[in-house]
Amino acid sequence: MSKNHRKEVDRRRTFGIISHPDAGKTTLTEKLLLFGGAIQMAGAVKARKAARHATSDWMAMEQERGISVTSSVMKFNYRDYEINLLDTPGHQDFSEDTYRVLTAVDSALMVIDSAKGVETQTRKLMEVCRMRNTPIMTFINKLDREGLEPLDLLADIEETLQIECAPLSWPIGMGKRFKGTYNLYRKQLCLFMAGQETRPQDMLVIEDLDDPRLDELLGSQADQLREDIELLEGAANPFEPEEYLKGNQTPVFFGSAINNFGVQEMLDAFVEQAPVPRPAPTTTREISPYEEDFSGFVFKIQANMDPAHRDRIAFFRICSGTFHRGMKVRHHRIGKDVNIANATIFMAQDRANVEEAFPGDIIGIHNHGTIKIGDTFTDKEPLKFTGIPSFAPEHFRRVRLKNPLKSKQLEKGLIQLAEEGAVQLFRPLFNTDYILGAVGVLQFDVIMSRLKNEYSVDAIYEGVEYATARWVECDDRKVLEEFEKKCQVNLAYDAEGNLTYLASSEWRLGHTMEQWPQVVFHKTREHN
């Protein structure tokens, strides 16, 4: 392996941002791009009804509602590090897409609202990170408003999420008395002016807590800060990089993303401490990012990122080797060699053609319906990357057309949207209905909105008597045929042709499982 390849791998940081809705994740994303020089002015999310929307929220429905319902990928350069930032859906209904994004990152940044502490979505996402031992850095946001005491917030994180906290910055006051942060990582005090949308050219830095300027600037809060820091240096957990990388400890920063408080300090610590691209598991062996042979997997498909082009993009995580524009790779699921001529890198909706890319990078491959979530591409070895599941949906709707002449457009729209993983599509064995299944109900609104805006299809939903689904398998062909005959009314094929049992209740599901012990019912399914 060349020195240059190792250097390129080592300077990459690929991470996702996770939080409960409204903790300020989109604002923080904007500010990271601002400090990285990727944008000159933050998108002022509060002005979302005006013409300017947050850079990472580009779909029409997101701009109307002010929620992130798809995950964007953004690349920027900071202090000679190449950073790939994956912005995950902020609404609790989008946990499945968020999970898939977390399969493509090496670490995560958790955003917590200082007034609310740990909330339900944060807890769920943390469970996903735990399954993969993903290192987590924490940003406690909205210190410019009144909130919980900093020590109480740390205790809440430790108790609720069962992870040790190591504060690397400390707030000076909160709400109207918020003056800035003391950086324990660099032993520096940083004072900011509120309300800056553009990147500040310089910050006031005071390195000695006994500096008399501290009293001039902070007044009575100066002594409180000195007491806090003395207490922390004696009682708080010291930051241990190895424990962070194992997922046992989270370094914590305090700040106010909307006012640029504490964001750059966190970004500085992040690029120095966050992991380089990690090895990736396959069905046969672990793939090191330092290997020379090219490999990677598709973790997301997004239709119509550019409505003018009616395109579909497959988001692809490079796991090893170097990507070169125009290179020939093997698409293993379909057993074909393909040339990737026009791969793209992303800056939210802006894109650029990529000439070369390295492990940790996320590239976009144009997809005309042949690529699916979970697909593996390599230049040699037949590999299959693991850990990219679908979850059993909990909510269901039947789709009906207002105009029967639009049936082809409806079918095309539903198939493409199901391929994205935004919703699951089922076709019952005994009729021609389209049944949609989702992990959360907001997904149905998104699908209806996108059918109308992107496929010019007016449709309505009808309720159906389903409460849960399971993918079914049986090694005994005769038993499976008998099962299909007896349970036909509850059986459907999903978009990939997998047989699925749709149950009207958990009780009905349990009863059927007892009746058919040779049939296996799966709650999750790996993408083929």
From Swiss-Prot:
A Gene Ontology term for the protein's cellular component: cytosol
Pfam families noted in UniProt: EF-G_D2, GTP_EFTU, RF3_C
A GO biological-process term: regulation of translational termination
Alphabetized Gene3D superfamilies for the sequence: P-loop containing nucleotide triphosphate hydrolases, Peptide chain release factor 3, domain III, Translation factors
InterPro entries, A to Z: EF-G-like_DII, EFG_III/V, G_TR_CS, P-loop_NTPase, PrfC, RF3_C, RF3_dom_3_sf, RF3_GTP-bd
Subcellular localization(s) per the UniProt record: Cytoplasm
Disulphide linkage map: none
PROSITE patterns: G_TR_1, G_TR_2
Domain tr-type G: start-end pairs: 10-278
CDD domains to which the protein is assigned, alphabetical: RF3, RF3_II, RF3_III
Main localisation: cytoplasm
GO molecular function, one term: GTPase activity
Chain positions recorded as GTP binding sites: 19-26, 87-91, 141-144
Functional note: Increases the formation of ribosomal termination complexes and stimulates activities of RF-1 and RF-2. It binds guanine nucleotides and has strong preference for UGA stop codons. It may interact directly with the ribosome. The stimulation of RF-1 and RF-2 is significantly reduced by GTP and GDP, but not by GMP.
HAMAP family associated with the record: Rel_fac_3
Similarity comment: Belongs to the TRAFAC class translation factor GTPase superfamily. Classic translation factor GTPase family. PrfC subfamily.
Protein name: Peptide chain release factor 3
Species assigned in the record: Syntrophotalea carbinolica (strain DSM 2380 / NBRC 103641 / GraBd1)
